[in-house]
Amino acid sequence: MNALTPLSARLERSDGHALVTLARSRGAVRLRDLAQRGSAKAFLPRVEGDVPEVVFLNTSGGLTGGDRLSYRLEVGEGCRATATTQTAERAYAAGAGAARVEVLHEVGRDGWLDWLPQETILFEGAALERETQISLAPGAGCLMVESVVLGRAAMGETLSRLAFRDRRSILRGGKPVVVEPLALDDRALAAAGGAAMLGGARALATLAMVGPGAEDALGPARAALGEAGVEAAASAFDGKLVLRLLAADGWPLRRQVARLLTVLRGRALPRVWQV
């Protein structure tokens, strides 16, 4: 390499992987294994009560073309846990290729996981491919949320170039019970004001609860709706509850999501959500 080598050829792409395994031992849910490398980190803060929290962090500060990021959590039989991210994830303009994120969680028999990542903010020219999958053993359940914000309204940002593919799925006994693919590109952004697309919304979220008695949460969930500037729809059947939300800005969406999660969980959100 010499002084004439193009800067773009010298840029290093981030690559991170974090794996956390929780299991019941001596009457409590404890950390059994922790493996992490590169830009992906995981830590377990001190919390009140007997439900541990796992916080994942991308130390690279954001995602751009060619980056790789993987988060995995294994929740043992009869264990309950909450997992989240340290902050909002940001996907910046991609120089070449797409950033790829893989989130794979497994919940053992009669276990429960609240997967509560903070929102993903997409910037102009971002290229991101993400797969989120939660696999539930018999008797297990989960609560999952995914929020996406198209630029920062407060900064006057409007997106016209984007390549975003996002697939979220929940498997119960190896069979998919919730599958939600989302694809947004330049053409979709151009049509985003139409009723068939986002209706002018710049922020969207999906909440899904799967497990025994999930349908019973429909009433409390609907009662928790009503944040100004947020449109929402909720349905429940066959052991699952699904809510979809649209908003013109990320802040009212975040407030509505936080209220819903607090109601559905019956306790406060992880502290990192409150910072």
Curated annotation (Swiss-Prot):
One of its GO terms (molecular function) is nickel cation binding. It comes from the Bacteria. Pfam families: UreD. GO terms for cellular component: cytoplasm. Disulfide bonds: none annotated. Keywords: Chaperone, Cytoplasm, Nickel insertion. Signal peptide: none annotated. UreD, UreF and UreG form a complex that acts as a GTP-hydrolysis-dependent molecular chaperone, activating the urease apoprotein by helping to assemble the nickel containing metallocenter of UreC. The UreE protein probably delivers the nickel. Belongs to the UreD family. HAMAP family: UreD. Required for maturation of urease via the functional incorporation of the urease nickel metallocenter. This is Urease accessory protein UreD. It comes from Cereibacter sphaeroides (strain ATCC 17023 / DSM 158 / JCM 6121 / CCUG 31486 / LMG 2827 / NBRC 12203 / NCIMB 8253 / ATH 2.4.1.) (Rhodobacter sphaeroides). The gene is ureD.
